[in-house]
UniProtKB/Swiss-Prot annotation:
GO CC term, one of those recorded: SCAR complex
Encoding gene, per UniProt annotation: napA
Main function: Involved in regulation of actin and microtubule organization. Involved in cell adhesion.
Keyword Cell wall biogenesis/degradation: no
PANTHER family: MEMBRANE-ASSOCIATED PROTEIN HEM (PTHR12093:SF10), NCK-ASSOCIATED PROTEIN 1 (PTHR12093)
Keyword tags: Cell adhesion
GO BP annotations listed: cell adhesion; cell migration; cell morphogenesis; cell projection assembly; cortical actin cytoskeleton organization; neuron projection morphogenesis
Family per record: Belongs to the HEM-1/HEM-2 family.
Coiled coil: none
Pfam family, one: Nckap1
Protein's name according to its UniProt entry: Nck-associated protein 1 homolog
InterPro entries xrefs: Nck-associated_protein-1
Subunit field text: Part of a Scar/WAVE complex containing brk1, scrA, abiA, pirA and napA.
Length: 1120
């Protein structure tokens, strides 16, 4: 430095500011290089290339003097461009660090030459910047020495550069020497700091009182009520005051680093009185300090190694050993501090939430509380995540704090409070600056009689800038920028702290005190986020992911701490604050890490809530099931057995019977049941989930409630499906009424979540149950619609034909013979099918109907094949049905008549079941949406039949469970069987009716065709033929344009003729003859096209009357 430069030309303030900012950037870059070189996945490939291994060994051995013509280096020749491209970022980072070191050394020398006086209580910003530069330089050089591949990287790059350009890279000689010098960074730095020890010692001595005050125990804090804003109610509105506000929220760990590194670099000062005590006190606080992020410095070991071997430092080494031995006491001290902070910060949060106007006057206390909480959290993290020295009787569990989540939550609460009321703070401190501060500043400036022009201009600018402020600027949303004011104050500190300056800062403490407060107030206007980050940034957890996740898991499992687990995803929003503009490439990795962490935490919280809720729902369902009528007999048996049970000694042994609802009677409030514990856990967890509506993390917004909603949807969907208990192998499924009852019980339990979380459970139910009406849900999994459709069609309807199950129109259900283990009525009566309609909804019932229609279409397709096979005979029968002899002969020529009748019965059974589910759906919808159903009914009845949109109306009505003359689903299913020529199609389906008509008498020869009056059904379900004939005829005629009434009249005529021939066979014992006669009446009664007049014109009514009389006289074995 030239001695001719004036104090203003030296620009000490500007240089300190720039170098500190650049030093942080250099630390970030060297940190990433160290991590990259230590990780095999990110390590430069050249360093692991087997072909380059001899070259690298040679470079490391000869570094920095290497012979470029050495044979070991020939392998680099072919890849010199790739080496330079791959290692240039690494190399020039070291070059930048060397330049930073040179600039920092030059500035420290200039400061010494100017005899700058440092005092943290006088020129805080200048002193802090000076000490920060010393610590940053020390940490940077230690980090350089920790990069294991530094010699190989630098030497390899320089050799490739020299091979390409014919000369060494210009910075390499100095860079190589720096690498050699700083292999032992502490000793080298101590040598360099010999000229600076006077300035360093002066700055550090001003910290002694502050460090002692900040190192008090938790009990001393509690007695002093240092964080209480209501300890003096009369002064609750009085602003927090301090001569140097920034000192109040200056962290102990920062002071500790200043003291440790400062005095150790200037170890000659340790012999001076008072300095040793403060240095030893710092050494007793744990066993490590933070260098940068998760890089720590084991100071006992490192300082011991540094001083070992130096003459006259045996006593200092003994002090280090004593401090290490007393380290265990710090664990209890920090634990006591955290206990106090939890209660103090919680109290502060509650008061400020009730009275946010106190944020302004008590902001200094808030920042103080956040800073010491932040300090304690960082101390705990670095000591938990780094193993203690083996010689110390400490384990990692000694440092672990199960109540850490509570402290993290308290910090986050205070942060969110400050951020929420940002405008309140701005209004308060703008008024403070433009009122009290500027008034006092004018008076203080007037007292200064002698000052240079530069200083006069700076102080005048202070007054002008503060005088121009007004609250209207806050109301209009104007952005404030006080960075220039703060930099001018730093310049003023530098100008007036130099020996011989006029005026000297130490002679104007009123100005110092006032400007320190002005700077503090200005930061709370334009740098609120930065100030909060300074005292409460928890981005350190980004670099301790294992500890972060482990703490979260423990918090989630601890019922007393689970309400605070929301702090962990909130902390993920801090991660991006640790990034640096000097290393933009790390933004995406850190951002991705923050996103994955917050997603993991919120997902785990939602899953835990879901798991607890599933257990609660299971217990509620069990309690609900105790009220089912199926459990009534067992309950009565258990009640009776209480009175009869005795042991061998004739002593009464009561088997305690617990009736439903007994759990509601409590003997004491203290006794918690398992359900109580689960509900308590759920309440605590839901409190965490609902703590905030949104969590911003790296340009993303996360909504905790949405995670819970998605988990509840997934859980509810799986629960509904599991309630069906569908067993494919054993072909079993739960009764729809039981499933519906369980679903309603679960919905009732889930609905209680609204009391805890405000989650819209109605949306969850609608979303899940709507998906359950489809064959597959959004995840592609089978739903209850698919399961019940498969079971009813592939299992139940098959059993109808094979196990003797009968459709009873009288009971409106399918029933089976007594003694069978399977009860068809339990799945097909009115209550069950209405329950099925509620579960499947209109969409699900339509899907079930479509699948039934496909089965009918399959049967009709087979019938069509049989008709075509017998086409010639059927054509002849159609024209000669009134000629007995010819007709009998033609009937004998027909093939597969029994097959035709069986398929018609199958179709009829499917259609009968279809009718039952349609009636159930209609009943349910009339209860649920009566207005809409009345509109559909009116439209179905009054919409013109000739209109082109009539089919749409019928489809709507059918989907709502209403009966139409022609089923549109059946029409659509049979449309695929239509012939190209309508004449051929009409003929084919007309012949099918002829086939059925002449085949009906064959049923009279089967005993299974007898009619059961109690069920109003035939034992072989022959009565279902009436449904199949009417429905198929209507659908086929609708598709091909034929007249269904003509076809049915023809069918009636042929059937009547065929059945009347049975009466002439008196010599044969046809038990089912009268039962078959009834089929004709059923066809007419169910047909929308035929009337009894038409029937009487071709079949005597007397025969029907006698047939009904005959079948109802018979007594059949009852069906159950």
């Amino acid at each position: 430095m030239e001695r001719g430069l004036s104090v203003t030309e030296q620009k000490l303030a500007e240089k300190l500011t720039i170098l500190n900012e650049r030093g942080e950037g250099m630390l970030t870059r060297i940190y990433n290089i160290k991590k990259a070189c230590s990780d095999p996945k990110s390590r430069p490939g050249f360093l692991m290339d087997k072909a380059l291994e001899p070259s690298i060994k040679y470079i490391v051995r000869k570094f920095p003097q290497m012979d470029t013509k050495a044979t070991q280096l020939q392998a680099v020749q072919s890849i010199q461009n790739e080496v330079m491209k791959g290692l240039s970022n690494y190399y020039f980072t070291f070059v930048d660090i060397m330049e930073f070191k040179d600039n920092a050394s030059e500035l420290l020398t200039a400061i010494d030459a100017s005899f700058v006086h440092f005092d943290i209580t006088l020129n805080f910003d200048l002193t802090k910047a000076y000490l920060d530069l010393i610590v940053t330089l020390t940490a940077l050089m230690i980090m350089v020495s920790r990069v294991d591949d530094r010699r190989s990287v630098l030497g390899l790059f320089n050799h490739a550069f020299e091979m390409r350009n014919g000369r060494s890279e210009e910075s390499f000689p100095r860079l190589g020497q720096m690498i050699l010098d700083y292999d032992s960074p502490l000793k080298k730095l101590a040598e360099q700091f010999v000229p600076h020890q006077q300035r360093v010692s002066t700055a550090l001595q001003s910290l002694h009182e502050i460090y002692l005050r900040k190192s008090m125990t938790g009990e001393q804090w509690r007695q002093g009520q240092i964080l209480s804003i209501i300890n003096a109610p009369a002064n609750i509105l009085v602003p927090g005051q301090s001569k140097v506000p920034a000192v109040e929220y200056l962290e102990v760990s920062v002071i500790q680093r200043w003291i440790m590194f400062g005095y150790t670099m200037c170890h000659q000062q340790l012999a001076m009185p008072g300095i040793t005590d403060i240095w030893k006190m710092a050494l007793q606080d744990g066993f490590c300090i933070t260098l940068f992020r998760d890089e720590i410095f084991m100071f006992h070991k490192e300082f011991h190694n540094m001083l070992d071997g130096m003459k006259g430092y045996g006593k200092r080494i003994k002090d280090i050993q004593d401090a290490a031995n007393q380290m265990a006491a710090s664990v209890g001290i920090h634990k006591e501090r955290r206990n106090y902070l939890r209660s103090a910060l919680t109290e502060m949060t509650l008061i400020l939430a009730d009275q946010p106007g106190l944020l302004g006057p008590k902001m200094l206390i808030i920042l103080h509380g956040l800073s010491i909480a932040h300090d304690e959290i960082l101390w705990l993290v670095r000591h938990c995540c780094n193993p203690a020295p083996r010689s110390r009787k400490l384990t990692q569990e000694d440092f672990f704090d199960s109540k850490l989540p509570h402290l993290l939550f308290a910090v986050e609460e205070l942060r969110s409070m400050v951020q929420k009321y940002s405008s309140v703070l701005q209004r308060y401190f703008i008024q403070y600056l433009s009122g009290f501060d500027v008034y006092m500043l004018k008076q203080v400036v007037q007292k200064i009689s002698i000052c240079s022009e530069d200083i006069s201009l700076i102080m005048t600018s202070f007054i002008d800038e503060l005088s121009s402020l007004s609250v209207k600027q806050v109301e209009s949303g104007e952005l404030f920028h006080f960075s220039g004011l703060r930099l001018d104050w730093l310049r003023l500190q530098a100008y007036t702290s130099v020996r011989g300056s006029s005026p000297e800062l130490k002679d104007n403490r009123d100005l110092v005190e006032l400007m320190n407060n002005v700077v503090f107030h200005s930061k709370l206007v334009d740098l609120q986020d930065e100030t909060l980050a300074e005292v409460s940034d928890l981005s350190i957890f980004c670099f301790y992911p294992g500890f972060f996740e482990e703490s979260f898991v423990r918090c989630l499992e601890d019922i007393t701490q689970s309400r605070y687990c929301i702090a962990f995803p909130l902390i993920c929003g801090h991660f991006m604050t640790c990034t640096s503009d000097f290393c933009p490439e790390e933004r995406h990795p850190i951002g991705d890490r923050s996103l994955s962490a917050v997603n993991l935490f919120l997902d785990s919280m939602a899953k835990e809530a879901r798991n607890i809720m599933s257990q609660v729902c299971s217990e509620h369902i069990q309690q609900h099931q105790q009220l089912w009528h199926t459990h009534a007999v067992r309950m009565m048996t258990e009640m009776a057995s209480e009175r009869r049970t005795k042991d061998k000694n004739k002593k009464n042994v009561h088997v305690e019977f617990k009736p439903p609802g007994i759990e509601s009677f409590r003997k004491s409030r203290e006794t918690l049941t398992s359900l109580d514990t689960k509900l308590l856990s759920l309440t605590e967890l839901c409190h965490a989930i609902t703590h905030t509506e949104a969590i911003p993390v790296w340009e993303h917004i996360f909504a905790p409630k949405e995670y819970l909603s998605s988990q509840l949807e997934e859980f509810f969907a799986k629960a509904v499906v599991s309630m069906a208990q569908y067993d494919i192998d054993n072909q079993r499924i739960a009764r729809p009424s039981e499933v519906l009852s369980n679903v309603k019980a679960m919905m009732s339990s889930l609905r209680s979540l609204e009391n805890y979380t405000g989650v819209d459970t109605a949306r969850v139910f609608n979303h899940v149950l709507l998906q359950q009406t489809q064959p597959q849900d959004s995840q592609g999994a089978n739903t209850i619609t698919q399961m019940y459709t498969t079971w009813y069609l592939d299992v139940f309807l098959r059993r109808v034909m094979t196990d003797g199950i009968v459709y009873s129109p009288r009971r409106m259900a399918f029933v089976n013979r007594p003694g069978m283990p399977f009860r068809a009525e339990e799945y097909t009566d009115v209550n069950e099918l209405q329950a099925l309609a509620e579960l499947l909804g209109a969409y699900g019932m339509r899907y079930l109907g479509e699948k039934m229609m496909l089965q009918i279409a399959s049967q009709v397709s087979e019938l069509k094949k049989l008709v075509i096979m017998n086409k010639d005979v059927l054509v002849a029968l159609r024209t000669n049905f009134d000629k007995p002899e010819q007709c009998i002969e033609l009937i004998r020529r027909l093939r597969n008549m029994d097959d035709v009748m069986l398929r018609m019965i199958i179709i009829g059974v499917i259609l009968s079941f279809r009718q039952l589910i349609q009636q159930a759906l209609d009943s349910v919808l009339k209860t649920r949406v009566p207005y809409m159903m009345s509109c559909i009914t009116d439209m179905r009845k009054n919409f013109p039949h000739g209109n082109n949109d009539r089919q749409v109306v019928d489809e709507m009505a059918t989907s709502a469970g209403q009966e139409c003359v022609v089923d549109p689903l059946l029409c659509a299913a049979l449309r695929t069987l239509k012939e190209k020529k309508s004449e051929d199609d009409i003929l084919t389906w007309s012949l099918l009716l002829v086939f059925v008509a002449v085949g009906l008498p064959s049923l009279a020869y089967k005993d299974a065709s007898e009619y059961n009056g109690e069920l109003e059904a035939h034992d072989n379900n022959a009565h279902c033929i009436s449904s199949s004939v009417n429905s198929i005829t209507g659908a086929l005629c609708s598709n091909n344009g034929d007249n269904p009434e003509d076809r049915l009249r023809e069918f009636l005529a042929i059937t009547s003729s065929s059945l009347l021939k049975l009466g002439m066979e008196a010599e044969k014992d046809l038990k089912a003859r009268e039962s078959v006669y009834l089929l004709l009446d059923m066809v007419v009664q169910q047909s929308p096209y035929l009337t009894m007049d038409v029937l009487e014109s071709c079949f005597p009514y007397a025969l029907l009357r006698n047939a009904y009389h005959e079948v109802y006289q018979k007594r059949k074995e009852p069906f159950l």
